[in-house]
């Protein structure tokens, strides 16, 4: 399954989440496309809830199904901690996500484009793979010749706050994971146990 590249507001309304982070997609019509009102939803099965939760998380991180499933399997091999929490931490360690968390991009989609186009460095070396696994302490920066790109400068200026698990130098345009995130620092609206249940039936 390929990555969805259409309007994010359609996915936001279908899944009941704001992929833009602004909530504007849901403000006017907080119900699925095609419905005639907020009360027209039918009863959702247990499988339907599991599927919806999986789709929410996958779209939030902007991944295709193959990438998402592969990372889920990788998380299952971590011996310590809960599978669902380990999975969410691995999602946070993707390079495109770290670029977003540092405030170098306003959305994960924009962050992925910056990585794909070769504007991002890891420990001083250019890396153009969005799924690159970032370790604690690795320095994520912007290539010197890319530092005047307007979208990057605007994103940094617009960033009000950053998660406690990252540090960022606005002068150098570089930052890093200072530690791995705790579960309570990541999306309280997501029930990762439902995602685990979904894949346990599939794998």
Curated annotation (Swiss-Prot):
One of its GO terms (biological process) is ribosomal small subunit biogenesis. Residues 93-156 form the S4 RNA-binding domain. GO terms for molecular function: rRNA binding; structural constituent of ribosome. Keywords: Ribonucleoprotein, Ribosomal protein, RNA-binding, rRNA-binding. The keyword Lyase does not apply. SMART domains: Ribosomal_S4, S4. Residues 22-45 are annotated as: Disordered. The keyword Lyase does not apply. NCBIfam families: PRK05327.1, rpsD_bact. Part of the 30S ribosomal subunit. Contacts protein S5. The interaction surface between S4 and S5 is involved in control of translational fidelity. Belongs to the universal ribosomal protein uS4 family. This is Small ribosomal subunit protein uS4. The lineage of its organism: Bacteria, Bacillati, Bacillota, Bacilli, Lactobacillales.
């Amino acid at each position: 399954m390929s990555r969805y590249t259409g309007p994010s507001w359609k996915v936001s309304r279908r899944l009941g989440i704001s992929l833009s982070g602004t909530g504007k997609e849901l403000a006017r019509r907080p119900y699925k496309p095609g419905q005639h009102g907020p009360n027209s939803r039918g009863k959702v099965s247990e499988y339907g809830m599991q599927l919806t939760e999986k789709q929410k998380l996958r779209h939030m991180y902007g991944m295709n199904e193959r990438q998402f499933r592969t990372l889920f399997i990788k998380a299952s091999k971590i011996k310590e901690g809960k599978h669902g929490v380990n999975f969410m931490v691995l999602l946070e360690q993707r390079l495109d996500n770290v670029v977003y968390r540092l405030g170098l991009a306003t959305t994960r989609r924009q962050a992925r484009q910056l990585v794909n186009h070769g504007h991002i460095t890891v420990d001083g070396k250019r890396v153009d793979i969005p799924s690159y696994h970032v370790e604690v302490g690795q320095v994520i920066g912007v290539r010197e010749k890319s530092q005047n790109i307007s979208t990057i400068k605007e994103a940094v200026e617009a960033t009000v706050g950053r998660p406690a698990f990252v540090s960022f130098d606005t002068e150098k345009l570089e930052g890093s994971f200072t530690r791995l995130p705790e579960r309570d620092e990541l999306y309280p609206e997501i029930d990762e146990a439902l995602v685990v249940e979904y894949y346990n039936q599939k794998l």
